[in-house]
Amino acid sequence: MTLEEYIAHLNGLAFWKEFTFAQNKFMPRPGAEFELADNLVWFGTYAIAMQLKQRNEETQDSETERSWFQNKVLGQATSEIRDTLRFLQEHEQIHITNERGHSFDIGSAELTDITKIVVFLGGRALPEDCWQTRYHISRTQGSFILLPRTII
């Protein structure tokens, strides 16, 4: 089971499949496909936007693993969540389908609060301080919660 499948399953159990959205590709115009988020949990005016990063080609070198963490978790994943927030602002409605197969249109007009979470599964040689990192502060989007797969 991939990290994305695991989180979709876990969120489906915790938040019910009606509120969990794991298939979030949308096309704002022909030929342009984007992903809103790896996983989205949506309750009316509140949403949790999640990006998931899994280390597939781990090494035994802790500095290589630290570099992966900095580039993929702190860099790419937080950038992708910033894209999620931008997509919601730029598009009046984005059509998404929940884990029950029901489709909805979501837009920033109805969202008053969005929690930003990055879930990561690093390699065995990932340094302990990376595993213990629980937040990231963005200059433009505030704080992001970081959760290692080991605690969920």
Walk through the language-model features, giving the residues of each.
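Intrinsically disordered, low-complexity Ser/Thr/Pro/Gly-rich regulatory segments
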Residues: 1-152
